[in-house]
Swiss-Prot record:
Gene behind this protein: RPS19
GO cellular component: cytosolic small ribosomal subunit
Pfam families: Ribosomal_S19e (PF01090)
Transmembrane region(s): none
Self-association and partners: Component of the small ribosomal subunit.
Subcellular location: Cytoplasm
Name of the protein this chain belongs to: Small ribosomal subunit protein eS19
PANTHER family: 40S RIBOSOMAL PROTEIN S19
GO molecular function per UniProt: RNA binding; structural constituent of ribosome
C-alpha cells in the first residue's frame, strides 16, 4: 500500500490521475469503448466520453491500495445489479475485457508488473505519489 492514499479524497485523486493519463498519449482504449456497455447489468453505454480513463484511474487506485488485483477481481468490483423484470435483481460482474485491457495498458506503460505481491513498479509508485502530493495541496 502506498502511503497517503487514504489521506486524499478518492474523487479528487481519480480526477487528477485521469487528467494525467489523458495528457500522456500512451493509453490505447478499447476499439469500441465509445459504444460498448461496461457490463451485463447495464442497459446503456456510459454517457461520459472519457469513462475509460476514469476506470483506469480507479483501477490504479485499487492496485495502490490492495497491492495486486486480477481481472476477475475487477469484474466483480465494478459489477452491478441486473434488472430481471419482475424477478429479483441479481448481481452480475462487469465485462472482464475492460479490466484486462486496462491492466495491459498499464503493463505497456511500465506502471505494473506480474509480481503477485506488489504489482506497481517504481515508476507507477512515483507517479501515484506525485498525484497524491498534487491533490493534497
Amino acid at each position: 500500500m502506498i502511503e497517503g492514499i487514504y489521506e486524499v479524497m478518492p474523487e479528487k485523486f481519480n480526477e487528477a490521475l485521469k487528467s494525467y493519463l489523458k495528457s500522456t498519449n500512451e493509453v490505447v482504449p478499447l476499439q469500441d469503448h465509445d459504444i460498448m456497455k461496461t457490463g451485463e447489468g447495464r442497459e446503456q453505454a456510459p454517457i461520459e466520453e472519457d469513462w475509460y480513463f476514469t476506470r483506469m484511474a480507479s483501477i490504479v487506485r485499487q492496485i495502490s491500495i490492495k497491492g495486486a488485483v486480477t481481472s476477475e477481481f475487477l469484474a466483480k468490483r465494478y459489477g452491478s445489479l441486473k434488472n430481471r423484470g419482475c424477478r429479483p435483481s441479481k448481481y452480475v460482474g462487469a465485462y472482464p475485457e475492460i479490466g484486462e485491457s486496462v491492466l495491459e495498458n498499464l503493463k505497456n506503460m511500465g506502471w505494473i508488473n506480474e509480481h503477485p505481491k506488489d504489482m506497481l513498479t517504481e515508476k507507477g509508485k512515483t507517479i501515484v505519489r506525485e498525484i497524491i502530493e498534487k491533490v493534497r495541496e
